[in-house]
Amino acid sequence: MRIGLLTEGGYPYVSGDARLWCDRLVRGLAQHEFDVYALSRSEHQEDEGWTPLSPNVRRVRTASLWMAGDDGAILGRRARRRFTEHFGELAAVLCGASGSVPVTGGASTSGENSQAGGAPTPEADRFGNALYGLAELAREEGGLAGALRSEAAVRALERACRAPGAHRAAREARVPDLLAVAAYLERALRPLSLDWYEDDGLGAVDLCHAASGGPAALPGLLARHFTGVPLLVTEYGVRLRTHYLTAPDAPPAVRSLLAAFHGGLAAEAYGKAEVVTAGNTHARRWQERCGADREKLRTVYPGMDARPFAEVGESVECADPDALVWIGRVEPAKDLVSLLHAFAEVRKQEPKARLRIVGAPAGTEGAAYLAHCRALAAQLFPDEAEGPHAAGHNPVSFEEVGGPELPVPADAYASGAVTVLSSVVEGFPISLVEAMLCGRATVSTDVGAVVEVIGGTGLVVPPRNPRALAEACVALLRDPERRERLGAAARARALELFTVEQNIEAFHSIYLEIVSRAPVRRVVLDAAGEPLPFAVPAEARVPVRWAAPAPGLAARGGPGWAGGGPVRATTPVTAPERAR
């Protein structure tokens, strides 16, 4: 089949998010063709170029979210009036005037997919109606780039904030807040003006797969709206949660309005998608609170390449039995301060213990945090010397992967007997899975998907509790047999659940499920414009009854294509073109 892979700030760019996952997915499903539609986030990302493409990537189309383009569209009076109406309706939903898109609970904004059989309210459809109204206007007029940056858009947003029924944060929005929100909406809605939704674009694929929520899912929603192509949404991090975590210092009005936008877009994507996959149960709970129907949800764990860690995982224990290892990006969310205080307690009971902190800082904030941690380590653990003529040493070391002692990540995990994770905020703990693949016993804080990943193969303590963290580390340092048992169990669990192979197989099954239940009805034409005989198998015209769902799942209706909906004529697809 032919898949339209939708990304934002990710594949195929070298520095993209989830680049490795997308590349492994495309290469692992070599029997399918992929058309990649990528939204870039920065000029730097574009300048770094693309990762080498798999042979089954048919073509790549890109668009920018960081640079304001000019589509040259000039709206007439009637078009401007339509734009003001639809954008004003979208702004009213975000401001909560006369109802708002739910971002909690279980109701979907889609009329087709209401939770627990409940009928969707008219207010719940307002976000989608306004969004598709803008999309149809953009398609007719050739784009909305100028309109979304116009004074009319800001004034429509201001009217919505001042309207009766608007929530408190919206009513308190000032001019800088309105300008910031309008600028963000203009960037996020740029996919409305793209020419990706014709019969030679996303209209020619069998399935759209959005590799994340947010703007990446928007082209999939529009392809479904205009051409009926089914949509699959995959999220390893929920955009609404990311917004809350990354914008703590934004003005309340900006935080509130953008949270409403992310929640509304997420609810619309979940409602219209055939299947929604989450990377873990933690993300799945967020999806449910944003309106996802439980019957559509699947949990597909990220796939990791186990081969680089095989030698360490299968070798006889050769690590320093007194060493604790922490590996990851250095940033405040990792709470290395608590780890250092916990290690001070460990040293009181195990004087030979050492702590290796392996990782590079994440941005300027991470660099400042790393400097603070170095200063704290020097204060807590003054350099110790065995005698008056010996050089002193610190039991805490700060290192990075790639040096002579730790050329690759597997060497870092192999250097310690216990791997520690001390985060206060965590999504899917990649470093923890790598430690499990290396057969290492782990001590982790109970955040994000840690408990789900660890199962019963490691010790879990509350976050921000240095004493509990220290006690767990001491318990494992003193019991090598227990470390060995936990490490073996951890490696077995990781190989069973978190490998590339299981990830690829899961998505292959989901692709087949979606295309079999929601195929795109097309009339294929030959060079003369006549219907091409036998272009579609006879089975596509036969209504069938699907097997009963598994026990405990609600029964689903028959396939949508059996109802005899209108068919859409398309021109034949040309020979595969080179990726550009």
Residue ranges and their predicted role:
Residues V447-V460:
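Short acidic/histidine- and often glycine-rich active-site loop of Leloir-type glycosyltransferases
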Residues L370-P404:
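Nucleotide-activated donor-binding/catalytic signature segment of Leloir-type glycosyltransferases, i.e.
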Residues A441-S444:
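Short hydrophobic beta-strand element within catalytic cores of glycosyltransferases
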Residues L459-P466, A475-E481:
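Conserved acidic donor-binding segment of nucleotide-sugar-dependent glycosyltransferases
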Residues E268-G271, A390-G416, L437, R467-E471:
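Short acidic alpha-helix that forms the nucleotide-activated donor recognition element
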Residues V424:
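Aromatic "clamp/platform" in nucleotide-sugar-dependent glycosyltransferases that forms part
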Residues A468, R482-L497, N503-E513, V523-A527:
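A short, well-ordered alpha-helix in the C-terminal region of glycosyltransferases
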Residues E311-R347, R354-P361:
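Conserved donor-binding/catalytic core segment of Leloir-type glycosyltransferases
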